[in-house]
UniProtKB/Swiss-Prot annotation:
Record's protein name: Trans-enoyl reductase iliB
One Pfam match: ADH_N
Residues binding NADP(+), per UniProt: V50, D51, G52, K53, S177, A178, A179, S180, Y195, L242, D243, I331, K332
Keywords associated with the record: NADP, Nucleotide-binding, Oxidoreductase
Family the UniProt entry places it in: Belongs to the zinc-containing alcohol dehydrogenase family.
Enzyme class: oxidoreductase
UniProt organism field: Hypocrea jecorina (strain QM6a) (Trichoderma reesei)
Binding-site residues for substrate, renumbered to this chain: A145, A146, I147, A148, T149, V150, G151, L152, T262, P263, T264, Q265, F266
Keyword Nucleotide-binding appears in the UniProt entry: yes
Any one GO molecular function term: oxidoreductase activity, acting on NAD(P)H
Domain of life: Eukaryota
Task performed by this protein: Trans-enoyl reductase; part of the gene cluster that mediates the biosynthesis of ilicicolin H, a 4-hydroxy-2-pyridonealkaloid that has potent and broad antifungal activities by inhibiting the mitochondrial respiration chain. IliB collaborates with the hybrid PKS-NRPS synthetase iliA to assemble the backbone of ilicicolin H. The PKS portion of iliA and trans-acting enoyl reductase iliB work together to construct an octaketide, and two methyl groups are introduced by the MT domain of iliA during the chain assembly.
SUPFAM superfamilies, A to Z: GroES-like (SSF50129), NAD(P)-binding Rossmann-fold domains (SSF51735)
Assembly information from the UniProt record: Monomer.
Length: 350
């Protein structure tokens, strides 16, 4: 293993201590570094709804919480330097001192010392992105899980072709609130529809001339599933949810439903409580690796916009309060970001 400097024996980590309960452990072990991993000194983290939801629905006592991170590579697993996969796919290799971001599987009973809400996080070298010049750690920390989820959802579960060029060229319509409409149109949506409207699904079907074939449900409750099913054309199509969908919402035989659990991108089993107890999905890993190549190009070209963010003070100790705000639905249209490390590790490369 190659390291930037002498690593500490312990770290600060936000640990699951009970249902919907987390606490900072100031003397937690560092995560083990697998041969294909890089170890990242975390600079910033952001909160996703899944962080609190996982601690509530499937708490793994003693596991480190957290998904999204950005930071600096401080150690390489034994096989990383010899693996030329990134170079073969026109990606810059990951080396010590690189600024990177990504998402990891926190609250993992099979790897309890690894999670984003900590001083250090281990992540596969193939499944991490470089932070482009001009992008700060706070902004990068908002994007990892979102980009990974989009890739699995669109190009694996919905079955859309992975774009060979910068853009897929597919027309997009979306639901949102009126307050977010200008933003989504600027980001490239063809049209937006108010999800609170009782005619939302019908309006989308009319706008798309009864031809909509693919729906991605980022909310996944009975109401959002109903909108998607009504919006899909009479010929049917594919519906993908970002959570286990309510079976009673599957009201059309012509629609094929699926749901995404993004940690399957790592190709390992997930041992949460049902329905989140999943066997390894090697094809999800393969798809993720291909998508990360395309996504890095989109990131470098400035074609992926970050989510609006709110920087919070207090560092790691303040993250539990933010998790609770997100869990209660008090944070809308933005992501909370916390700085874990005030200065970068030494010997950072350009």
């Amino acid at each position: 293993m190659t390291v930037i400097d002498v690593l500490p024996q312990t770290q600060r980590a936000l640990k699951i201590v009970g249902p919907n309960a987390v606490s900072v452990n100031a003397a937690a072990p560092l995560p083990d570094i697998e041969p294909t991993d890089v170890l990242v000194r975390v600079v910033c983290v952001s909160i996703n709804p899944v962080d609190g939801k996982a601690a509530d629905m499937s708490p793994q006592l003693g596991a480190t919480s957290g998904t999204d991170f950005s930071g600096v590579v401080v150690a390489l697993g034994a096989d990383v330097e010899a693996d030329n996969w990134r170079e073969a796919n026109t990606m810059k290799p990951v080396r010590i001192g690189d600024r990177v971001f990504g998402g990891i599987f926190g609250n993992d009973p099979l790897r309890p010392h690894n999670g984003a809400f900590a001083d250090y996080v281990a992540v596969p070298a193939r499944l991490v992105w470089h932070i482009p010049t001009g992008t700060d750690f706070a902004t990068a920390a908002t994007m990892g899980a979102a980009i990974a989820t989009v890739g699995l959802s669109l190009f694996n579960y919905l079955g859309l072709p992975l774009p060979s060029k910068s853009k897929a060229g597919l027309p997009v319509v979306t639901t949102c609130s009126a307050a977010s409409s200008t933003n989504v149109l600027q980001l490239g949506a063809e049209a937006w529809f108010d999800y609170k409207s009782p005619t939302c699904g019908a309006d989308i079907r009319e706008h798309t001339n009864d031809s909509l074939a693919f729906a991605l449900d980022c909310i996944t409750d009975t109401a959002s599933m109903g909108i998607c099913y009504e919006a899909l054309g009479s010929a049917g199509g594919r519906y993908v949810a970002l959570d286990a969908f309510p079976v009673r919402g599957h009201t059309r035989r012509s629609v094929v439903p699926e749901w995404v659990c993004t940690p399957t991108q790592f190709g390992k089993a997930i041992r949460w409580t049902p329905p989140y107890d999943l066997e390894p999905r090697p094809y999800d890993l393969k798809c993720a690796e291909l998508w990360y190549v395309v996504a890095q190009r989109l990131i470098d070209e400035g074609l992926i916009a970050s989510h609006p963010l709110e920087k919070r003070n207090g560092g790691l100790s303040a993250v539990p309060e933010g998790m609770e705000e997100v869990r209660r639905g008090q944070i809308k249209g933005k992501k909370l970001v916390y700085t874990i490390l005030d200065s970068e590790p030494i010997a950072v490369s350009a």
